């Protein structure tokens, strides 16, 4: 089974038709078929729900569809991991010039030696520097 760390904005690409790509759809299909497991830090849920909320207020998705998407994503094979909020996380953020919440994704990927599915312009090079594989859209 393929396993990887899933960044929130990568996940949101599944929710907005103009942002989907072959790569994002391929990962979604793997998860839907239970051929993959996505690891996410606890903050991922807040970021995802916030992104859906912004999508509603900006007219990119209607409420009913957003709630349906939220439910469908929650049913995917996910391993939600609470990342300790401590000095180590801050040190990682500073070392790679990342926001602390982005460092939580990097920390999770590094700890479990997993690829990182991300669209973030700062997180991708940080993951490469850390020796991690990147799954990009």
Regions found by a protein language model. Give the residues of each.
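Acidic, PIN/NYN-like endoribonuclease modules and their adjacent C-terminal/linker elements
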Residues: 1-3, 98, 106-137
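Active-site neighborhoods of divalent-metal-dependent phosphate/nucleic-acid chemistry enzymes
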Residues: 75-119
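A cross-family signal for key residues in well-ordered alpha-helices
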Residues: 12-13, 50, 90-91, 107-110, ...
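Active-site-proximal, substrate-binding regions of enzyme catalytic domains
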Residues: 49-77
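Alpha-helix capping/helix-boundary segments
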Residues: 10-11, 44, 105, 122-123
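Phosphate- and divalent-cation-binding pockets in alpha/beta enzyme and binding domains
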Residues: 23, 47, 125-127
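Short, well-structured N-terminal submotif of metal-dependent ribonuclease cores
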Residues: 1-43, 55-64, 130
């Amino acid at each position: 089974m393929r396993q990887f760390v899933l960044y929130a904005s990568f996940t949101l690409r599944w929710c907005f038709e103009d942002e989907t790509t072959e790569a994002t759809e391929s990962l979604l299909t793997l998860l839907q078929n239970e051929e993959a497991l996505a690891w996410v830090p606890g903050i991922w849920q807040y970021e995802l729900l916030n992104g859906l909320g912004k999508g509603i207020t900006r007219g990119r998705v209607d409420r009913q569809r957003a709630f349906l998407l939220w439910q469908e994503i929650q049913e995917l094979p996910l391993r939600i991991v609470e990342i300790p909020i401590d000095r180590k996380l801050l040190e990682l953020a500073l070392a790679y010039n990342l926001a602390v919440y982005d460092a939580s994704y990097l920390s999770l990927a590094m700890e479990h030696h997993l690829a990182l599915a991300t669209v973030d312009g700062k997180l991708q090079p940080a993951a490469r520097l850390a020796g991690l594989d990147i799954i990009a859209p």
